[in-house]
Amino acid sequence: MLKSTLLAFGLFIALSARAENQAIAKLFLRAGVDGTIVIESLTTGQRLVHNDPRAQQRYPAASTFKVLNTLIALEEGAISGENQIFHWNGTQYSIANWNQDQTLDSAFKVSCVWCYQQIALRVGALKYPAYIQQTNYGHLLEPFNGTEFWLDGSLTISAEEQVAFLRQVVERKLPFKASSYDSLKKVMFADENAQYRLYAKTGWATRMTPSVGWYVGYVEAKDDVWLFALNLATRDANDLPLRTQIAKDALKAIGAFPTK
């Protein structure tokens, strides 16, 4: 009796996982985009991967590198914390939110490239290869441009590697100070309600065709932490909202993103 019960339970779990995959596949299908998402429970290790071949493929990290870059900058003393001020020099950028002074918190949230280029100059290009290797953050092709490498395709990472990296961030297993983790968590904060807190970063790799949109992060729910990394092929800027929309809908589909 016990054996048959366990078999039935195992079959139920398998069928549920398969249904969840189908539900998530429909999100990408309805949007008409090629993409992948990796979701993992920090507590149980339960994993869901849509489009496994793409999940293994590396793409330019783009602004998702700001997660690691923030930790590096804090550790190196290149910035002091989330209230660090970056003074705008008057250069007019195509993104209006960049055309003003920034704090680290605002720079992270609006993906201010010139702010993080200042950070890269303060850290120094020679420091980055060791940090990237030590944290297993994708692959850095050398030689590289010290203020462009996360944008120009020199630094690439897969969705699977993003989740593995985020796991180490959440568990604080990387060689960074507690204060660095604390500041990163503050700037990564994206949303909350009574059931969850969302920490995340977008990215858009535009120097390739098709361009690639990213959304990576984690959800702190009442009984678990769910890591996720999504990327998708974007046709133009009109596709960018799909990054967060599909990721949130996928997390909701498996119960990782409670809304009530």
UniProtKB/Swiss-Prot annotation:
Biological role stated in the UniProt entry: This oxacillinase hydrolyzes methicillin.
Protein's UniProt name: Beta-lactamase LCR-1
Alphabetically ordered keywords of this record: Antibiotic resistance, Hydrolase, Plasmid, Signal
GO molecular function: beta-lactamase activity; penicillin binding
Signal peptide: 1-19
Active-site residues, Swiss-Prot/TrEMBL: 63 (acyl-ester intermediate)
Enzyme Commission number(s) from the entry: 3.5.2.6
Sites of N6-carboxylysine modification: 66
Gene symbol of the encoding locus: lcr1
InterPro entries: Bact_Transpept/Beta-Lactamase (IPR050515), Beta-lactam/transpept-like (IPR012338), Beta-lactam_class-D_AS (IPR002137), PCN-bd_Tpept (IPR001460)
Catalytic reaction list: a beta-lactam + H2O = a substituted beta-amino acid
Species, as recorded: Pseudomonas aeruginosa
Activity regulation, per record: Inhibited by cloxacillin and clavulanic acid.
Regions crossing the membrane: none
